[in-house]
């Protein structure tokens, strides 16, 4: 005959051993990858205190891009239209360097020196981004670098296996 003391001891042992056995057969959680920071290849930008992009897991975060001409500290001509086009081209260049395209972009934040430029920016934006559009915010901002009329920061979804 089994005593109540034997049942209590068996219950205690089971409650202690079962969680250990379950964890021994369960796969361990994947290691958390640390962010990767990518400096700009541009000699001038390389000296600035920011990365051109950061990979965090499956996301590639592109630092704000203004409409500056490649390898120059000068803005593209053509006002908001020319600067918007160049800013998006600059985002596309950073994405390409890190294995992504504008089609991978899932979020953009737009900083406009004058919110009256929003319609003109949207016209250019729609030349590059097609439905379904990335999530997006736009805000008025004063003091954009180099006196730019627009700055664009984007995040792309690029699974590490596709990198």
Which residues does each PLM region occupy?
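N-terminal secretory signal peptides that target proteins for export/translocation
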Residues: 1-4
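N-terminal presequence-like segments and the immediate start of the first folded domain
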Residues: 9-89, 93-98, 103-106, 112-163
């Amino acid at each position: 005959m089994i005593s109540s003391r034997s049942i209590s001891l068996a219950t205690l042992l089971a409650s202690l051993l079962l969680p250990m056995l379950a964890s021994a057969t369960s796969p361990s959680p994947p290691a958390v990858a640390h962010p990767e920071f990518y400096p700009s290849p541009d000699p001038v930008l390389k000296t600035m205190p920011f990365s051109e992009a950061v990979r965090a897991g499956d996301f590639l975060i592109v630092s704000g891009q203004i409409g500056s001409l490649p390898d120059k500290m000068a803005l593209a001509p053509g006002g908001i239209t020319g600067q918007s086009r160049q800013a998006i081209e600059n985002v596309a260049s950073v994405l390409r360097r890190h294995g992504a395209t504008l089609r991978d972009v899932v979020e953009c934040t737009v900083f406009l020196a004058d919110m009256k430029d929003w319609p003109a920016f949207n016209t250019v934006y729609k030349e590059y981004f097609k439905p379904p559009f990335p999530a997006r915010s736009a805000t008025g901002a004063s003091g954009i670098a180099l006196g730019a009329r627009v700055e664009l920061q984007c995040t792309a979804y690029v699974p590490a296996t596709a990198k």
